[in-house]
């Protein structure tokens, strides 16, 4: 792999050829060489790494994701966050991996082409023409450096105010065609705080890259070879396999919908997590009533506009025929961001969620994490651990699952949520400022001490779901009612686990989660979109061997776990009652006899047996 090392302290760069299986494998190697496990998350000597996989530039679809490898402000260990389609333009520079160390004297943007690497001092622009936030900054860069974008067919990846002011900033990128943003082809590397790591650790606001280099391996451009591999495995050609395995994300004739938003509401029904996961405590009949309101007020407006009227489907900018980006009146719609600021916070009006998602997107923050912060604060106010005025509000949210008016209360909750979002950026309130800086886990412990006289049965941390790592690390799970989302896995906040609505004894659940973690880590290591996992996982060994001439090394997840152990950020026992109850209520929901959760020790035993089983499968010494 061709690796660009940029030293911001010295204003120098060098290019090295380093043999590596994929981007995460290389990133892990470099982080170990720099011993980043023992350094602060924002230490400038901790590398920020951004790169693509080996399959780019040829005839393979869905292989142009770029992956950020960084020490996460949330988990306090390495995290990996990918962004769709960016590699299709970035590969043109001839660089496979960008490694950034040091701290720029002024806020800057890095420009990379086959001819040069430039570091330009640029102040952030949060309002430009008719654009706001990351959209404004992206537009500003496109116009100011128009010649660079045109000459090198370049694309920009930028951070926003969420990276400047909070722990929860992400990376944003909009594909460009004919000097304009390509509708729907926007994406974020959302989870884990990649943007905050890039800006606070290195004072970098963005990276712009392009050129005309294509495939790295000739066989990646050999369609006959690719097609033969799929014919041998599936008995059908490559394109036919793609159409079959990705129909959920494009269009499913059975449901007459598609994409994660269109499909998940139909699939999960009363198993959807609502009201910050409070829904898990209520009977199926009540959850079903909520679900019916969500379908009517939240899902149908999207379905009618995107699948009946306009059929506005796009790609992220990758070479891809799935067109998973479903666009509602110019805004890309996916399940998790819209659910996070929709039903998860007690907002069942689709247009209201759209406004909130767009606001958080403009600020360049991870929408899922923001949804957790809002639902947590709503619950704390509902349970009188905080007063509205203490978080900058002048009215109470409606967060009672049994007594909720889907229309009127949704508008009210949406209005209040907007104030909280603004407060997280402006830090015009002591508690919101604390959360913006420290995140949920550390903040909850500070609030436990500050308001200890208010605590009766439940502490501040009991009203929010998160998984803990080491002393301060944590991550809020993706929005599925699944024990695997909070089980003691080394990487969470993504799909490196068994996230099905199921339950099993810990050693069995650990095995299925381990299997998913191995496969998901390899898919991401190679820069492949996980929407293609059903396409590539069955042929991954063969495909990698044929194209690169090398065998696929499956020890990556073990090496990641070993790094986390060195960083003192391995999984630790649940601190949140609601996280514990996410596991036990799924057991109850399925009428499972595999485990009894009657006392605290039962939860501890399930967690410990899971962790011991996982470590055994990984070959780690306890």
Feature map (PLM): residue ranges:
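Short coil/turn connectors at secondary-structure junctions
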Residues: 1, 44-47, 94-96, 105-107, ...
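N-terminal basic/disordered segments at the start of proteins
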Residues: 1-36, 91-92
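Extended C-terminal regions of large enzymes
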Residues: 6-8, 13, 23-24, 63, ...
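Conserved short S/T/G-enriched processing/targeting/catalytic segments and their helical context
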Residues: 22-77, 101, 341, 358-361, ...
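Acidic/Gly/His-enriched mid-domain segments of enzyme catalytic cores or analogous surface patches
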Residues: 40-74, 88, 102, 106-174
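Alpha-helical support elements that line or immediately flank enzyme active sites
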Residues: 76-98, 182, 186, 196, ...
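Glycine-rich phosphate/pyrophosphate-binding loops
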Residues: 83-117, 195, 200-215, 368, ...
């Amino acid at each position: 792999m061709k690796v660009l090392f940029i030293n911001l302290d010295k204003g120098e760069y060098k290019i090295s050829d380093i043999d590596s299986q994929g981007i995460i494998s290389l990133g892990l190697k470099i982080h170990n060489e720099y011993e980043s496990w023992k350094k602060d998350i924002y230490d400038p000597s901790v590398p920020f790494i951004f790169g693509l996989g080996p399959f780019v530039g040829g005839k393979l679809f869905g292989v142009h994701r770029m992956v950020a490898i960084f020490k996460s402000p949330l988990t306090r260990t390495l995290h990996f966050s990918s962004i769709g389609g960016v590699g299709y333009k970035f590969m043109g520079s001839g660089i496979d991996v960008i490694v950034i160390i040091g701290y720029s004297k002024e806020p800057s943007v890095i420009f990379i082409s086959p001819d040069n690497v430039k570091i330009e001092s640029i102040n952030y622009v949060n309002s430009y023409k008719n654009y706001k936030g990351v959209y404004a900054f992206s537009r500003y860069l496109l116009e100011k450096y128009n010649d660079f974008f045109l000459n090198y067919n370049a694309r920009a990846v930028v951070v926003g105010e969420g990276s400047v002011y909070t722990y929860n900033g992400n990376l944003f990128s909009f594909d460009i065609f004919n000097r304009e943003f390509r509708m729907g082809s926007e994406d974020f590397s959302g989870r884990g705080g990649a943007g905050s790591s890039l800006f606070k650790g290195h004072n970098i606001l963005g990276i712009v890259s392009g050129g005309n280099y294509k495939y790295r391996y000739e066989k990646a451009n050999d369609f006959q070879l690719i097609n033969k591999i799929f014919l041998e495995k599936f008995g059908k050609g490559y394109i036919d396999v793609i159409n079959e395995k990705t129909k959920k994300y494009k269009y499913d004739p059975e449901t007459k919908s598609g994409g994660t938003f269109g499909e998940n509401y139909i699939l999960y029904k009363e198993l959807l997590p609502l009201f910050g996961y409070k829904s898990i405590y209520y009977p199926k009949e009540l959850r079903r009533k909520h679900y019916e309101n969500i379908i009517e007020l939240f899902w149908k407006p999207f379905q009618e506009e995107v699948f009946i009227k306009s059929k506005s489907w796009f790609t992220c900018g990758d070479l891809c025929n799935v067109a998973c980006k479903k666009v509602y009146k110019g805004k890309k719609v996916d399940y998790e961001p819209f659910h996070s600021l929709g039903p998860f916070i007690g907002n069942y009006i689709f247009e209201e969620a759209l406004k909130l998602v767009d606001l958080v997107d403009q600020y360049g923050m991870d929408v899922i994490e923001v949804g957790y912060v809002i639902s947590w604060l709503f619950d704390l106010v509902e349970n009188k651990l905080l007063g509205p005025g203490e978080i900058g509000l002048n009215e109470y949210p409606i967060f009672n699952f049994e007594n909720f008016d889907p229309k009127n209360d949704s508008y009210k909750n949406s209005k209040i949520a907007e104030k909280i979002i603004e407060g997280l950026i402006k830090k015009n309130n002591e508690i919101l400022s604390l959360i913006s800086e420290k995140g949920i886990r550390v903040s909850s412990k500070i609030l436990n001490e500050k308001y200890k006289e208010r605590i009766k049965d439940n502490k501040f941390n009991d009203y929010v779901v998160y998984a803990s790592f080491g002393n301060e690390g944590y991550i809020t799970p993706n929005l599925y009612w699944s024990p695997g989302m909070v089980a003691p896995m080394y990487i969470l906040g993504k799909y490196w686990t068994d996230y099905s609505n199921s339950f099993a004894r810990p050693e069995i659940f650990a095995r299925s989660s381990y299997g998913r973690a191995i496969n998901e880590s390899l898919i991401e290591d190679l820069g492949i979109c996980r929407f293609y996992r059903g396409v590539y996982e069955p042929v991954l060994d063969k495909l990698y061997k044929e194209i690169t001439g090398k065998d696929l090394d499956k020890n990556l997840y073990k090496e990641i776990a070993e790094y986390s152990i060195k960083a003192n950020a391995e999984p630790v026992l649940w601190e949140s009652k609601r996280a514990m109850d996410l596991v036990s209520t799924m057991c109850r929901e399925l009428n499972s006899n595999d485990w009894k959760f009657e006392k605290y020790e039962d939860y501890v035993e399930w967690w410990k047996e899971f962790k011991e089983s996982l470590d055994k499968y990984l070959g780690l010494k306890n």
